[in-house]
């Protein structure tokens, strides 16, 4: 793993402290930046997440993904599901399902509780499956 340092120019290009490049796949990068705006997730009329402190995770071969601090997510109707996945660039993922008045929305949210060492620290952040929410960002 190599960490590169990148400096932007001007007020619209924040300084990126670290861009992770993986030795086992040269050219593959993962990095985060602060989200440029307030982020919200709604399911039906329920506000599930609302933050001004979100992150955008950029990863080679993927679209950018918004991550929300866990403290800004309403966990009261979320339940840990049985689904887990593994990403060689970020680590093992656990998923959460949302209990609603009409049933469950399965695996609506994911979390990397212990990201691999090379990954930016997203252990206190969660992501959402955009196709399963009614309104976002």
Predicted features, each with a name:
Residues 1-137:
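Terminal leader/tail segments of proteins
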